[in-house]
Design a protein with these regions (language model features):
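Terminal amphipathic helices with adjacent charged low-complexity linkers/tails
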Residues: 56, 185-234, 248, 257-260, ...
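Nucleic acid-processing catalytic cores of prokaryotic defense/repair systems
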Residues: 15-21, 28-65
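Flexible glycine/acidic-rich beta-alpha junction loops that bind and position SAM and/or redox cofactors
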Residues: 79-88, 136-138, 168-173, 197-201, ...
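Glycine-rich beta-alpha loop elements in corrinoid/cobalamin-binding modules
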Residues: 32, 51-246, 253-254
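Conserved, mostly hydrophobic/aromatic
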Residues: 160, 268, 303, 307, ...
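Radical SAM enzyme core and accessory elements
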Residues: 1-5, 217-257, 264, 270, ...
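N-terminal pre-triad scaffold of radical SAM enzymes
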Residues: 23-25, 284-311, 344
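Conserved SAM/AdoMet-binding glycine-rich loop
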Residues: 19, 54-55, 334-482, 486-490
C-alpha cells in the first residue's frame, strides 16, 4: 500500500480530511498520524498529509485546498515545547522526529500556531485537534515555560473540537457524523471530545463543575482541587462530563471513549502501514525516530502503574488493553520480511512491557478504582499477577523463522514481576531478553518521595535487584541493572538527595544519566510543582524550585564526577552534612583542594615579568 498523498498531484479530487502534523510523515503504527490516517482510509475516507508545513504564513496550508470535511491537527508524538526545550529551558539542537534529526521544522505551541494559520487561510472551516499536546492541555493547565496557568488549548487554538486519549473510535464517529452533514458545532454527544459552549448549554452526560479559569489561574488550592476532580473522572465506566468556565462560555469535556477491544486493536495494527518514513526525506538523512521502533512490536496500551510524573494515564488511560498473541505474531512475521531486518526484534512492549489485559476482572466490568492505585503503596488484592500470556508471546515470537533474538526494551514494572509467585517469566527475561543491561526505574530511594511519585518502595527495588543478580549468576551471565533516577521531584529535599547519593555509593551505582523533574502538562507531579500541594490529600509538599538547589540535587546523583565535587560540597554545607566531606569510607567528596595543591607538580607556564638582564643565553648546538 503506498504512502498517503503529501502533494496535490497524488490526490484524486478534494480530500475528505487533511492531517496537519508537527512531525515528519512516518507511516508506522508508533506514530499517531499514521494510525489515524490509516483508520480513516479503511473507513473509506480520503486523507492528505501536511507534515511540518512552513508556519510563518498561511500559504503552505492552502497546498491541498479545502478538505471536504475537516482539518485534523496534532503537534506530533511529543508536546512541541518538550520537543524543543530541555528542563533547563534551553533550546534543543536536535529533533528525532524531523528530517536529519535537525530542530526548527515545527513552531513552539504547534497546535495553536497551525490552527491559527488554518483560520487565516480558510476562516470558518471545521478544525479538530488531538494528540498528546492537545490531550494533556485540554483543561486550564500549568505551563512550565511561562510559569503560569494557561487556558485550555482549545480556547487558544480556536479549534472546534478537541479529541483526547486514543483517537481511533472518536475520529471514526466524528467522521461518520460530518459525512452525514451534521455541522461540527452541533456534535456534542461523542465521548472523548471537548468543546466550547454557551453558559446555557446542558451536557448530554452527568456533569461536574471544576472551576472558573479566572480562579484556577490565581488560586492554587482551587487548581489542585480541579486536578483531583479531573483525575477522578478519567474512566469511561463512571467518569462524568467536566465543565470549566471561561467568561461567558464553558468548556465541556465529555466522558472518555471506551478503550479499543482486543479485536479492534488487532485491526488497527493490521492496517497496511509502509513502516518507514516517506521517501521525500531520504535526501535529508531520513527520520531518526524510526530507528527505535522499526523492528519493535507494541502489544499493549494504557498503564495501571499510574506514576504521578507520567502523562500516560491522563492520555491513554489506566485501563490496559492488549493485542492478541496471534496479531503480534503476524506483525513479527511481517518484520522479518522488511528491508534491513537482521534477525533482531528490538522490543515487544508498550507503556509497561509486562502488562496484559487480563489483570483485573473488576476493572473489566466497572472500571479501575476511583481513589486507589493498582500497584501502590502495595499491590491490590484483586490484581491478577500473571505473566503466562506475555511469556507465551515472547516464546512464539522468538520461534519465528528468521528471528535470532527478541529483546524487551520497554520499561518492566518490577514490583509486578516480584509479585508473580511463578519465577518462569523472571528467569526467561534474565536468560533471553536482556541485551547486557536491563533498564528499570526506581527513580529515588526516599520512600516519602517515592510515595509522591506513585512508585513502589525502595525495599521493593532492592528485592528485585537481589533476585535479578542471583538469577544472572546462576545462569553464568554478565548483566547489569541500569536504574533511571530523578532529581528535584516535588517532595525531594536536599536531605533526600543526599540520602540518594549515599544509597548509590553504598550500592556502587554510578549513574551516567539522571533526569531532573520536568513539569509537563497533565500530570499530578506537575500539579504539585505549581501548587505546592498534594492534590489527592491536600497536604503541603516541598517543591525545589531554586536554581541552585536543583543544580545541587542533580549533582548529588552523580557525586562521583570530579566536575560535580564543588557543587556537592556546597550542597553538603547547605544541608549541614560536613561529616560527608573527608577521606572516610562514607564520605561523598574530599575537602576542597587548595589552589597551591592543584598546581603542585605542574610546570610553571607563566612568563617572567620584566626584562632579562644581561645577554640572552646562547642556544646549544645539537
Amino acid at each position: 500500500m503506498p504512502f498517503l498523498p503529501v502533494t496535490p498531484e497524488e490526490l484524486q479530487g478534494q480530500p475528505d480530511f487533511i492531517i496537519v502534523t508537527g512531525d515528519a510523515y512516518v507511516d508506522h503504527p508508533s506514530f499517531g498520524t499514521a494510525i489515524i490516517s490509516r483508520v480513516l482510509e479503511a473507513e473509506g475516507f480520503s486523507v492528505a498529509i501536511l507534515p511540518q508545513p512552513e508556519y510563518r504564513s498561511c500559504e503552505a496550508f492552502k497546498k491541498f485546498g479545502k478538505p471536504r470535511l475537516a482539518f485534523l491537527v496534532n503537534s506530533g508524538n511529543i508536546d512541541s515545547m518538550v520537543a524543543h526545550y530541555t528542563v533547563a529551558k534551553k533550546r534543543r539542537n536536535d529533533d528525532y522526529y524531523s528530517p536529519g534529526g535537525k530542530a526548527g521544522y515545527r513552531p513552539d505551541r504547534a497546535v495553536i500556531v497551525y490552527c491559527n494559520r488554518i483560520r487565516e487561510a480558510y476562516g470558518d472551516i471545521p478544525i479538530i485537534i488531538g494528540g498528546v499536546e492537545a490531550s494533556t492541555r485540554r483543561f486550564a493547565h500549568y505551563d512550565y515555560w511561562t510559569d503560569s496557568v494557561r487556558r485550555s488549548i482549545l480556547v487558544d487554538s480556536r479549534a472546534d473540537i478537541l479529541t483526547y486519549g486514543m483517537g481511533e473510535n472518536i475520529l471514526r464517529r466524528l467522521a461518520f457524523l460530518l459525512d452525514k452533514g451534521v455541522p461540527v458545532r452541533k456534535i456534542r454527544d461523542v465521548r472523548g471530545t471537548v468543546f466550547m459552549e454557551s453558559r446555557e448549554f446542558c451536557p448530554h452526560f452527568e456533569s461536574a463543575f471544576i472551576g472558573e479559569y479566572d480562579d484556577l489561574k490565581t488560586d492554587k488550592k482551587e487548581y489542585a482541587k480541579a486536578f483531583r476532580i479531573q483525575n477522578e473522572n478519567q474512566d469511561p465506566f463512571y467518569g462524568k462530563a467536566l465543565v470549566e468556565g471561561y467568561d461567558n462560555k464553558i468548556l465541556v469535556q465529555n466522558p472518555p471513549m471506551h478503550p479499543l477491544t482486543t479485536e479492534e486493536l488487532d485491526k488497527v495494527y493490521a492496517l497496511p502501514y509502509m513502516r518507514a518514513y516517506h521517501p521525500m526525506y531520504e535526501k535529508d538523512g531520513g527520520i531518526p525516530a524510526i530507528q527505535e521502533v522499526q523492528f519493535s512490536i507494541t502489544h499493549n496500551r494504557g498503564c495501571f502503574g499510574n506514576c504521578n510524573f507520567c502523562s500516560i494515564a491522563f492520555h491513554q488511560g489506566r485501563t490496559v488493553t492488549s493485542r492478541s498473541v496471534e496479531s503480534c505474531l503476524e506483525e513479527a512475521k511481517l518484520l522479518t520480511k522488511l528491508p534491513g531486518f537482521k534477525g533482531y526484534i528490538h522490543d515487544v512492549g508498550g507503556p509497561s512491557a509486562n502488562f496484559r489485559g487480563n489483570y483485573c476482572e473488576k476493572a473489566k466490568k466497572a472500571g479501575v478504582c476511583k481513589n486507589k492505585n493498582c500497584l501502590t503503596p502495595s499491590i491490590c488484592k484483586n490484581m491478577k499477577v500473571d505473566h503466562e500470556e506475555y511469556l507465551e508471546l515472547l516464546k512464539k515470537v522468538e520461534a519465528i523463522p528468521g528471528v535470532k533474538k527478541v529483546f524487551v526494551r520497554s520499561g518492566l514494572r518490577y514490583d509486578y514481576m516480584l509479585a508473580d509467585k511463578n519465577d518462569d517469566f523472571f528467569r526467561k527475561i534474565v536468560k533471553d531478553h536482556v541485551s547486557g543491561q536491563l533498564k528499570v526505574a526506581p527513580e529515588h530511594c526516599s520512600n516519602h518521595v517515592l510515595k509522591l511519585m506513585g512508585k513502589p518502595s525502595i525495599e521493593t527495588y532492592d528485592r528485585f535487584k537481589a533476585k535479578f543478580y542471583k538469577i544472572t549468576e546462576e545462569l553464568g551471565k554478565e548483566q547489569y541493572l541500569v536504574p533511571y533516577l530523578m532529581s528535584s521531584h516535588p517532595g525531594s529535599t536536599l536531605a533526600d538527595a543526599i540520602e540518594l547519593a549515599l544509597y548509590l555509593k553504598k550500592n556502587r551505582i554510578n549513574p551516567e544519566q539522571v533526569q531532573d523533574f520536568y513539569p509537563t502538562p497533565g500530570t499530578a507531579s506537575t500539579c504539585m510543582f505549581w501548587t505546592g500541594l498534594d492534590p489527592f490529600t491536600g497536604e503541603t509538599v516541598f517543591v525545589p524550585k531554586d536554581y541552585e538547589e536543583k543544580r545541587q540535587q542533580r549533582a548529588l546523583l552523580q557525586w562521583y564526577k570530579p566536575d560535580n565535587h564543588d557543587t556537592v560540597r556546597k550542597a553538603l554545607y547547605r544541608a549541614g552534612r560536613q561529616d560527608l566531606i573527608g577521606f572516610g569510607p562514607d564520605c561523598l567528596v574530599k575537602p576542597r583542594v587548595l589552589a597551591k595543591e592543584r598546581s603542585y607538580g605542574k610546570k610553571d607556564t607563566k612568563k617572567p615579568q620584566g626584562k632579562t638582564l644581561g645577554k640572552k643565553p646562547m642556544k646549544k648546538k645539537r
